[in-house]
Amino acid sequence: MEPVIDHIQITVRDLAVAEPFYDQLMPLLGFVPMKKGRATIAAHDFEVVEYQHPRLAFAITSPRAAFAADPVHRRRPGALHHLAFKAGSRAEVDALYIELQRIGATIVTPPREYPEYIPPGYYAVFFKDPDGLKYEVVHTPPAAAP
C-alpha cells in the first residue's frame, strides 16, 4: 500500500465562523473553490463542508452538541497536534505568509529555517485558524540522490 491520505475531517466549534476563513484559506493551498460541497449527516449528528482536490479532500465538521463547549488543545489525547502542507519553494512559503496575514490567520511563527528539524533546509510558516488549530506550510529541499 502507498501511504497516501484520501481525506481529512477537522471538527471546528462553529461552522458559521470557520467556513468563511477556510473559504479563503483552501484556495491558497491549491483547492479549487468550485469543488466545495456541504452535507448534513443526520445519523452522526454533524454538518460537513468539504473542499476537494484531485489528491485530497479536506473537510470541516460541526461538533456534537455534547462537546461544543469543550476546549480545543492540540496536546490532548486524540487531538491533532498540527497539519502541514508542502510548498514547492521557499518563495511559495513567503508568498503564502503574506496571504495568511491578509485573511486573518493567527501567525504563530513567520517563515524561517528550522535547523533543528529534519531534513536540513526545513523552511516553514506556522499559523492557526479561528479555533486555534495549528497548521504549517513547509518547504524542504529535494532529497539528495543516493
Which residues does each PLM region occupy?
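Vicinal oxygen chelate
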Residues: 12-17, 83-123, 128-130
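Long, continuous compositionally biased terminal/linker segments
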Residues: 44-88, 95
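Short, contiguous alpha-helical
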Residues: 127-144
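Core segments of cupin and vicinal oxygen chelate
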Residues: 9-58
